[in-house]
């Protein structure tokens, strides 16, 4: 049932019920268990007008559904909100239970911590043979306590808030226990506590309330009691005497005290103390306190005292409320109707005991037995902020009638004010009075257990427990020794709490914890994960220092409060290990001194995947340095087939010179100066800086530049060819030379001599290769071949078509030597420092290892036959297309056949070469050949080699 808040107090109207007055049958235990729920009636539509007793209400909206009821928000004629509860009653037995709940609410009406009763009525349906009871009560707008707790999952309830909730609930329970005869709620739980206003709570749901139940003695009564407890109580809040009926201890007010202890535990830790174990732990009262959240030791002792296994060891409601008010620091104005005796209906107190200064218990022989009580044990707390528990004073005077009326309204005394005045004692009761004299003089009007016409108080029979012999006192000491002492509670607390605060050092000691946390953060910074190092490599403008140096620099500039992940994602870790070679390609970090990022050589198996990734990820490519010309003396010692690829990383000693040289190189890339002589002279003198320490650095850097272009895509290739001129002598592989040359507008006259050198080579091999029509110039496979990295080219040279490559490209060792001698005579060098035999020496370094394979010869023969058959048929095509001068083989029209194009192109090159030889000049600075007439043969010849290689594969 969901009830809730009204700012204006509820108006109490005239109550008109069929039976007037108080009925004892309403509070007796029903003879049959609770009815089994069936399908309830349909919901009442909004706007329906219903007469409930003397109040006419209009249904506003549907709120919730209970066990056997529907709850609606209704408005009176004065538009005040109330709650209308429509209860489903299948038979007369269930009607008796509902009538008992209504009677309980009527008796408790007007209490500040109990939901107020307004009116009720009952209807009988002959057609359906059932009853419907309408109960009108107070509306609580704050909702349930459980909803409020759900809003505090991150920040749990404070101890002050818990004490306020317990104080309001215990005040409502005390009103029930103070009745004559007393009523027990039997269903105390957080679901039955409602929030009226901020920090104000009320108790509801009195359907399980009844008078105390006597111990069961026969099998029939045991079975009946078990069924009744199972129907009207909540399992996790049941006391041990409710679970084990054979103990024959009776179910009285001490069962509600147990439920208060469970309620307090759940308010603290959001769970019940016996939820994981079950009934076996309840029977033994075995539980523990979690280490978090932290509450005071006095709060834990209060919960432990309420959850005692024996009912007689639990405090009564007055002692419970007194302890709560003392923890709050608020005086308790509720009278003690028990006269200082920890008694209940069916569980009388034990013999009184006195605790000596040493901590032992000794019997009291000088005082009457009933005046001593086993209260909540007074324990020395570990915190100086918590005051010790005070026992109820035995010498205090009884409260006056005016104080009772001003502080607490008793349901019984409100009906009989004249009797209450006569029950006030005229003098305090001396401590030495006898037991009979004490019970003849009542201490409070709430202690009255009879009707208003009798002045003799009927109290539960208490046996004469005055200690007469030492033997009796010893037996009682043994019984009460089960009370938890200070040492026992401290041992339990030490076992449960993981991190207990130091004694005599304040509430908490955090200095060791802060020291440990600081050390942990320092260790985390020193042992940085791979992801953090990767971020440093990406965004730091200089090479990242060691982890220890980085941690020290971070610690000097920033606080150590940042959180560093200690566990890396598996997918991220695998990706970083698989793409280690290409990790730097995806980083556009700042360049120091003009150096471009240095990619590593990818594997041949994954070069197509890497090219696909690079085309997608590179929106803006990094700057690419032009290749560097290397002299033949440096190039002669290179063996590309054997040497692994190592990027040219600048050393620390020559860092300044390298930065300056790279800066000049980048200016050469962007510059469009027509004075090519000064640029070439500058570039010729520049490589010596990179060749001081390592002879292989020039080779690796030239390989690196070509490989970097392969991965950055077509956009970077076009950007490079429009801004720089690359010499063919700088490239070790013709395949890689093709990749770096797409459209170059300035070339040196060394290419003229190179063209002359190629005349004999092309004329001898033209008949074998000019008719290759299997692959078009713009085929997708050829484009992918253009992007083959350097590592793949080394493997191609040692592949199955190595013999064809050697014969076509170099014409054998003898032919290479003959070309070398002829070109030395005819070559006119542009620069005086340039050696003319670089290319032959570089070409002699190619070693073909698979030229003797029979499958290579067979493939070459098939290729030659196909070329011969198609040569005559394709010779006449494409004559009109020679006027086009494409800058790269990729731009050749598909209609122009390659064989015919090569043949006609060679003729044009021969004629151009003769023209240059007829007009030689000694001035090297005025010689700038036309790029359109000199550059294309190399591209076409090398693309021809690609076409040949693809056909062989």
From Swiss-Prot:
Catalysis: reaction(s): L-seryl-[protein] + ATP = O-phospho-L-seryl-[protein] + ADP + H(+); L-threonyl-[protein] + ATP = O-phospho-L-threonyl-[protein] + ADP + H(+)
Start and end residues of each Protein kinase domain: 57-326
A single cellular component GO annotation: cytoplasm
Chief location bin: cytoplasm
Cell division keyword on record: no
Enzyme class: transferase
Annotated localization: Cytoplasm
Modified-residue entries (Phosphoserine), positions: 872, 875
InterPro entries listed in its UniProt record: Kinase-like_dom_sf, Prot_kinase_dom, Ser/Thr_kinase_AS
Sites where the protein binds ATP: 63-71, 85
SMART domains: S_TKc
Signal sequence, start to end: none
GO terms (BP aspect): actin cortical patch assembly; actin filament organization; regulation of clathrin-dependent endocytosis; signaling
Annotated Polar residues bias: 355-369, 378-402, 433-444, 558-575, 748-766
Bilayer-spanning residue ranges: none
Pfam families: Pkinase
UniProt feature, compositional bias: Basic and acidic residues: 656-669, 767-778, 865-884, 937-953
Active site, per annotation: 187
Chain intervals with Low complexity compositional bias: 547-557
One GO MF term attached to the UniProt entry: protein serine/threonine kinase activity
Region (Disordered) residue spans: 343-402, 427-451, 538-606, 641-669, 748-791, 864-953
Keyword Magnesium belongs to the record: no
Alphabetized UniProt keyword annotations: ATP-binding, Cytoplasm, Kinase, Nucleotide-binding, Phosphoprotein, Serine/threonine-protein kinase, Transferase
EC number(s) reported in the record: 2.7.11.1
Family: Belongs to the protein kinase superfamily. Ser/Thr protein kinase family.
Protein name in UniProt: Serine/threonine-protein kinase ppk30
Organism: Schizosaccharomyces pombe (strain 972 / ATCC 24843)
